[in-house]
Amino acid sequence: MDKLPPSMRKRLYSLPQQVGAKAWIMDEEEDAEEEGAGGRQDPRRRSIRLRPLPSPSPSPSAAAAAAGGAESRGAALGGAADGEGPARGAAKSSTNGDCRRFRGSLASLGSRGGGGGGGSTGGGSHGHLHDSAEERRLIAEGDASPGEDRTPPGLAAEPERPGAPAPPAASPPQVPSSCGEQRPADAAVKVEGGAAAGDQILPEAEARLGQAGFMQRQFGAMLQPGVNKFSLRMFGSQKAVEREQERVKSAGFWIIHPYSDFRFYWDLTMLLLMVGNLIIIPVGITFFKDENTTPWIVFNVVSDTFFLIDLVLNFRTGIVVEDNTDIILDPRRIKMKYLKSWFVVDFVSSIPVDYIFLIVETRIDSEVYKTARALRIVRFTKILSLLRLLRLSRLIRYIHQWEEIFHMTYDLASAVVRIVNLIGMMLLLCHWDGCLQFLVPMLQDFPDDCWVSLNNMVNNSWGKQYSYALFKAMSHMLCIGYGRQAPMGMSDVWLTMLSMIVGATCYAMFIGHATALIQSLDSSRRQYQEKYKQVEQYMSFHKLPPDTRQRIHDYYEHRYQGKMFDEESILGELSEPLREEIINFNCRKLVASMPLFANADPNFVTSMLTKLRFEVFQPGDYIIREGTIGKKMYFIQHGVVSVLTKGNKETKLADGSYFGEICLLTRGRRTASVRADTYCRLYSLSVDNFNEVLEEYPMMRRAFETVALDRLDRIGKKNSILLHKVQHDLSSGVSNYQENAIVQRIVQHDREMAHCARRAQATTPVAPAIWTPLIQAPLQAAAATTSVAIALTHHPRLPAAIFRPPPGPTTLGSLGAGQTPRHLRRLQSLAPSAPSPASPASSPSQPDTPSSASLHVQPLPGCSTPAGLGSLLPTAGSPPAPTPPTTAGAAGFSHFHRALGGSLSSSDSPLLTPMQSAARSPQQPPPPPGAPAGLGLLEHFLPPPARSPTSSPGQLGQPPGELSPGLGSGPPGTPETPPRQPERLPFAAGASAGASPVAFSPRGGPSPPGHSPGTPRTFPSAPPRASGSHGSLLLPPASSPPPPPPPPAPQRRATPPLAPGRLSQDLKLISASQPALPQDGAQTLRRASPHSSSGESVAALPPFPRAPGRPPGAGPGQHVTLTLPRKASSGSLPPPLSLFGPRAAPAGGPRLTAAPQREPGAKSEPVRSKLPSNL
C-alpha cells in the first residue's frame, strides 16, 4: 500500500466494505484490557486501531466504554426529544471499515453525518458518511505501523462554537451501525455533554502525534526491504517484496531485515571503519610508543563504540540461510544462531580496552600505578589490542555480501571483484607482516642479532622503520630474497618462514583467480580457438590439400568471426518474446533492405524471421543446382549471387533479395543454378516452414508467385502451375486493389534490384567516351550499334553534350518514361545457341573462325525480323534488286538508317535535339524532295566522296537525296559486279551478353555437294519465347548485277573527309589488349555487356578472300552457316575495325550480301521491331 499512488489509495479507501464483526471489532474483554492498559494493543495486529484521547471533563461515555457495554460501541446516534439532552459517546463506522469513536455534541456529530442533531431517537439504516476532510486524513494517515495508536482523523475538523444552538434536523441522522452490525431501532444511547463541554481534541496534540507517527513510520520503513533492483532480484516481484515487508512488521519490534536500507548504510559505515582499524592499529601498536595521546584514545573509543553497537544490532538482524535462501526473522532463532556462529570472535574483537584503562586511570591516580603501567602493562595492552585485528572476519563477511550485491545489482563480473578483493587482502597481509617484523624485536627490546640492531635503525623515524620492515616482508612473501640481509636470530628465522608460507599461499591464490578472470573475459574466443585446433587436426589426419585447407580456414573466419557459441541453444533457452526481439534485431538490415518485408505485415515478417537459419557461402560455391529438388529458399543479407540457366543467361541478385522460392511454390525441381560471386551471408528457410508461414498469409503467397513468374519470364522460362495460380487469383478477385498494388510494388522492386546488381558487378572498360544511352541501355540488338556510337564520337560537328551521361538518376531514364524494365526486356533480341561439335569453339584455347569468305546472313526458323529491317528483306519469290555502285560502300550503313534513322530524327530526347539541329546547318543544301525523311543525323557519318585521294569508288557516300528507298537495291535482274581486288576486308563486330546464330551463305557460285542454296545448314538454337524472338542483324542483298553508275555526287564542304584508318585505329584503342585474327579465317566476337544480361547482338562478318575471284573452299552459291560462340575470353577478341573507314569496301573486293533464306512456298512472317523507339 505504501507504493500505491494517492489516487489509487483514495479509491481503495472509498470502496464500501462489508467486514464481519469478528475481523475488526474487539470483544468486550479485549476492549476493557485495552482501556485499562492505557491503549496498548498487540503489535501483531495489522488493522489500524485508534483510541480516543481522554476528555478534560468526566464523561459517561468513557465509563461506558471502560465497562465494555455493547451499546457504547455500536448504538445508533440519537438525542433527547426536547433537543437539549447531554451527548454520549457514539460509534461511527468509517469508510474503511474500522470502528472509531467520536466525542462531541449532537450538532457536531450530526453535521458530520450530513443531517440535523436533535429530535427523537431513530434507528439508522446501514449507510456511509461522506466527509471530504475525513477522507483526506484517512488517506494521509492510513498506513500506520502495526504497533502504533493514533487519534482518529477528522475529529477536530470542525470545532463547535460554545453556545451555538444545534440546527434543527429535518430527519433523524442515519448513522451506520458498528462495523456492519444492524442495530435495532430501540437501541438508543443517551448522549451527554453539550457544546460547552470542552472534550474536543486540540489540533496541536493531533499534530504532535501525527509527526511522531510519521517519524516512526519512516524509521520502520528503513528496517524493511525496499523495492529496488537488488530486492526484486532476490524475491522475484514487487508483490513478494511487499509480503516480506509484512513479515518484518509481524516479526516484532526492532527487527532489521538484512536487505533493508538501514542495514545497507550501516554495513557500509562498518566496512570503512574496519579498514581504517586494520591499517591504523598495527602501525600505532608497533611504531608509536606513547599511546596516551588524545587522538589515539579518541579513535579507539569511537571504534570500540561502533563495534559494540554492531554487536547488539547483530542480535536483531535477520539471518540469511544459504541452504534454502530463506531469511530468519524470529528473534529467538536469530539469537541462537548468532551465538553459535560468530559471536565469540566479534565479542573478543570488540572488547573496549581503552574504556577499561580510562576508568582505572580516573579512579587510581597515583604515581606508583602510572610507573607500573608504563613498565609492566605496556606489553599486555599491546597484545590485547591485537585482538582487534580479529575484526578481519567481519571484513571478509561484509566483502562477501558486497560481492553478491555488485554481481546481482550492477552485473559486474564476480571474478573482477574477487581479483580486487584478493589484491587488497594481499596488501593488507603485507602491511601486517611488515609491522610484525618490527614488533617482535621491539617486544624483545631490540636484541643485538635482530635486523633492526644490525641495520642501526633503533632510533630512526617511524617512517624509515616501516619502509624497511615492509620491504623485508614483501621480499619474504614473494620469495625473492631476505631483504637487506639474511635473518640471524631465531625469532627472525621463524618470522621469515611464516612470511614465506603466507606469501606463497596468497601468490597461488592470486595466480588462480587471475587465470579464471582471463578465461572468463573472452570464453567465446577461447572456444573458437579450441574448435579450430580440432579442425586443423582433422585436416591433417585426412591429408587435405592446401587449397581446401585455406577454404576451410576462410569459411571459419567468415562464419564465426573468431567467436564461437551455440546460438540455437541460447535462443532456445529464452522466452518467446525475447527470442523474437533478438531475431528482429539481428535481421534488421535484412528487413530494411528487402522490399518483400518492407511492404509486408509485421506479423508475417516476425513469423518468417523466427524460422530462418543463418548460413555462409564462399565465392564460387553453387548454392542451388539446376534440376535438383528444392528444399530451401534463401534471403541475402550480404553478398552477390548469379542465377544461371542452361541457356547461359545470367542474372545478378544482391543484398535484400531472395531466391529459391519457385520450387517451393510448385513443388518441382530447380529451374536454375545459383552461384555465389562473393562471400554471401544468407538466411535459409525450409519448405515446411515456408508453407506453414504462407498458409497464414495468402497475400504474401500471391506476391511470391507473381515475383517467381516475372523472374521465370526474365530468364526465358515458363511454369504452367504458377501461371494458372496467378490467373486464377486474378480472375476470382481474391485480392483487392490495395493488395494488388503492394504485389506490383514488390515485383518492381525486385526488377530494380536485379538491374542494380548487374551494374554493381560489371567492370567499366578503359575506352574512349561514347554515347552513354547506346551502351547502358538494356538492349543492344545490332552489331553496328557500336560502330554508330564510335562514329558519333569522331564526328566534328556534333555537340559535346551527347557524350555525357544522361541526367537521369538511372540509365533507364533515357529510354523513355513509359518504358519499364519489363518492356525493355521484352524488346531485347536474344538468340542462345549451342556451338557445333565440329566448331573450333569446342576447345577453349582455340578461336572460333568462319571457314568461308563470302558470307550471307539469314534468320533462323521461328525467329522474327525487326520491323526496321523488314523492308530490307525481299520475299522468297522476288528477285534481288540491283545495287548502284555509288551506294555499295554505304550499304552497311543503309541498314541502320532504315532501322534507326526514323526514330533518331523523331525522338524527343533532349540529348538528340542538338544532333538534329546540327544535322541541318546553313552550309548544307536542303535535301531533294525525293529524299527519305529522318536522314538528318545519319548523313554525317557517310564516307567522303570520290574526290578524296584515299577513297575508292566503292567508298563514296552520297547525299540523302540520292539514297534510294531500297537502301542499296537496284532494279531486278541487274548482275552483280564481281570483286576485282584481293584485298582483305576489315571486320567490325558488336557484342553483348549473348551471341546469336547467324547463317551466312556466299553468292555467285554453285553449291558443293550436300548443300543447296535454298536450305542452308543451321545449328540448333533455343525455342523462341512468347515475349519476343531472337533476331539477327541482316544485311541487304547484293547478288544482282550492278546497275550503270549514277552521276557523281556533289562535294560536301561542311563535312571534312575522315583520315585513312582513323576509325580503325580508334577501335583498336578500345580493345588494344586483344590479339589479331589469324590470317586464314575470321574470328567471331562476343563481349559481355556491362549493363544488360539478356540483350544480344550479331556481328556482321565481312569475308576474308584469299583469291581475287573466289575464296578457297567455297563455290558459287555455297551456303555456310556460322554460329557465334557463347563466350569469348578477352584474349580471343579480334582487333575491331570500322565498316565505314577507308578500307570498309575496297573496289574489287567481294561484296558482303545478305538475304533471308526461306523454303519454297513459305509465307513471310510478320515482323516486329525489337528496338526501342528512341534508339
Curated annotation (Swiss-Prot):
Cytoplasmic-facing ranges: 1-259, 317-329, 411-413, 522-1175
Subcellular localization(s) per the UniProt record: Cell membrane
Compositional bias annotation for Basic and acidic residues: 128-140
Annotated spans, Disordered: 17-186, 801-820, 830-1175
Start-end of Gly residues biased regions: 111-126
Intramembrane annotation, residue ranges: 450-478
Name of the protein this chain belongs to: Potassium/sodium hyperpolarization-activated cyclic nucleotide-gated channel 4
Protein species of origin: Oryctolagus cuniculus (Rabbit)
Originating gene: HCN4
